[in-house]
Amino acid sequence: MWRRTYLLLLVIRVYFALSPSYLHPDENFQGPEVFAGRVLSYPSKLPWEFTADKPIRSVFPLWPIYDVPISLLKWFYAETGAPTPPPPQVIYYVLRGVMFLLGFVLEDWAVYELVPFARHRRATVVLVASSYVTWTYQTHTFSNSLETLLVAWGLVLIRRIVVNKRRSSVFSCAVLAFIAVAGVFNRITFPAFLAIPGLQLLPHFRRKSVSPPVSLFSFVGFGIFFFGIAVLVDTAFYRPSATLWDALHSPIITPINNLLYNSDSSNLALHGLHPHYQHFLVNLPQLLGPAYAMMAISLWGLPVIPTWLKNARAVSALSATVILSIFPHQEPRFLIPCVPLLLSCFRVSKSRLFLAVWMIFNAALGFLMGIYHQGGVVPAQLAMPSIISASSVESNDALPGEIPVVSATVFWWKTYSPPLWLLGTNDNSSLNIETRDLMGVPGPNLIEELEKLLPPCNVAGSKQAGSVFVVAPKSAAFLDRYTFLPSSSSVSSALELHELWSYRKHINLDDLDFGTEGVYPTLRRVIGRRGLAVWRAKRAGCN
């Protein structure tokens, strides 16, 4: 029975891995955007983390996840004689597939090893596989998803080293050193998860000190070695012209830059400040749902310590949550590594009520976060070259025999930032697409930008030079007054929006306005009018 359940959950995980929801801009801009632009020369815009004077993001742990698959695809297309590099949609789904495979193999394997009792392992693996976090966050290209795997395998190796008392565990210590370096360079939050469980290694190292402390030498030596490689990789990435002496004399150590940046509360204020209880009272319940409620209820028996608290997984997750709660910027994805750890401590209740609530919770959040959350941004950006080519006006400066150039400006409004790399390559330069991200500016500001850019149309029926497009959620009621309706003969404004393309599976949660509109009207607008559309902006009377 458990095998059939696990296989069904595996199919569900594949479905969500290939669904184009968009959970946070970091999943594109701190990974695929960087390497797609570097390897394939796709249009890209590096985020500030990579362009600051003291960059805070390392490419060392990202290289095997993004650079290697993209480079292999580039090589494969070149070997098969393809005239162009791999299209962005292929890159997009291959990277999603890589994240799925990493989670399927490494996360499930680690969970299976971390549970000490064989009779609980199958149920625990199924429980973790049934979490919407596994379906969605863990299959997206987040550094947090990679951190989950590194934390889990860090705990696995610590357990192997501690349990194996008769051997020096040189190889396990070397691998643990690599995981520690990769984890720190991936996210500076990584040590919070392994700091306390790692104390179990001290007696092991001390016990081996009777003879030469081979395990300790292995861990420290390989740690220094991998640290040096990581620093050299980052220095070469950010300063390509630097010599080896330059890298040794003035290295770029991104974790230190990251720590210094996040230690300044004024920097964190730019990203949003939260109360210190946000992780425990909001984020963990959002990630774990009824399982977290059952864990909280079990604490009422104190001072008797619940069984699920008496293991390194729970200590790792809860101690990390306490440490991360010190910092005032708190997002749910920071706690993604806690999900498999805490669920592996939880004994599945045989109550039908709990199982029903668990399934409803994960199904609802799975569809919301895995399909609808900003779900139209990626399909719209992938379709944008085709939309523009089919609808734009050719520029007037093309000479006879030349490929005419189509220029367009695309305004994105009330969406997450569109990944530029999804526009792909354009070797014939027939398309010139300028993307302007207006984020959530007031509606009148959008119209003002359109009025500035749209050329005058003095003669009715004349064609306007260039093209202007607007991408926005269909729930943005402000645009209704400008939307062109063929059934209406009257022109309500001097500016018209002609809908060219739409994608139904898109919900913009940032557009919720319960305070002004009320709960029901807001939900009716945001959910009832779900979808993302592409409009072409024109002045009234222009063709």
Swiss-Prot record:
Topological relation to the membrane, as annotated: Multi-pass membrane protein
Subcellular location field: Endoplasmic reticulum membrane
GO cellular component annotations of the record: endoplasmic reticulum membrane
Keyword vocabulary terms for this entry: Endoplasmic reticulum, Glycoprotein, Glycosyltransferase, GPI-anchor biosynthesis, Membrane, Transferase, Transmembrane, Transmembrane helix
GO molecular function: alpha-1,2-mannosyltransferase activity
EC class: transferase
InterPro entries: GPI_mannosylTrfase
A GO biological-process term: GPI anchor biosynthetic process
Annotated function: Alpha-1,2-mannosyltransferase involved in glycosylphosphatidylinositol-anchor biosynthesis. Transfers a fourth mannose to trimannosyl-GPIs during GPI precursor assembly. The presence of a fourth mannose in GPI is essential in fungi.
Family, per entry: Belongs to the glycosyltransferase 22 family. PIGZ subfamily.
Protein name according to UniProt: GPI mannosyltransferase 4
Organism this protein belongs to: Aspergillus oryzae (strain ATCC 42149 / RIB 40) (Yellow koji mold)
Taxonomic classification: Eukaryota, Fungi, Dikarya, Ascomycota, Pezizomycotina
